[in-house]
Amino acid sequence: WWYGHNAVGFFLTAGFLGMMYYFVPKQAGRPVYSYRLSIVHFWALIAIYMWAGPHHLHYTALPDWAQSLGMVFSLILLAPSWGGAINGVLTLSGVWHKLRTDPILKFLIVSLSFYMMSTFEGPMMSIKTVNSLSHYTDWTIGHVHAGALGWVAMITIGSVYAMLPKLLGREQMFSVKAIDTHFWLHTLGVVFYIASMWIAGVMQGLMWRATNADGTL
């Protein structure tokens, strides 16, 4: 998991944050809210992410000190994660009205909402008492897909929609209405999917707690 969580942290976070820092200001027509914050939270992610992996190994043969260290670093990770997300959202200061008419901007900003949700949920699930309920359940699957389908997929789709007209020499995409429909279908689909996983996961965890050591209720 030292490798596994770095894969999540760098393949599915750092690169897509770079996309966010390019396409959100471009689409909003505004400068990044804070360049200093972008640099600070980037290096904080680099420094902290590698020690978050042990939170996947709570209540296993991993030494208890390593499990606790993974939990602490996961909780610290909340600060740089939300720092980047808030920096992206506040880039819209003064142009919030564009969200009503620009579905590409909706994709980009709602992806940040999913990023904030999954980067809050991850540290929360790393707490040992919470993890004793969530571990090995569908809750974890819901958490991963909030990041994969909510953050990674939506920032990618928004970026592609923003980039294609420029590559093809057009003023805008063929149908803005179709992009808006795509946005709502995707958002509702992800919400229903991850909510069902959360509910199923909590029920699984509670049922396991209801059994005795020999597996009987």
Where are these regions (language model features)?
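Hydrophobic cores of alpha-helical transmembrane segments in multi-pass integral membrane proteins
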Residues: Y3-Q27, R36-L57, L69-L92, L105-K128, ...
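Flexible, glycine/threonine-enriched loop-and-boundary segments that flank and lead into catalytic domains
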Residues: N131-T140
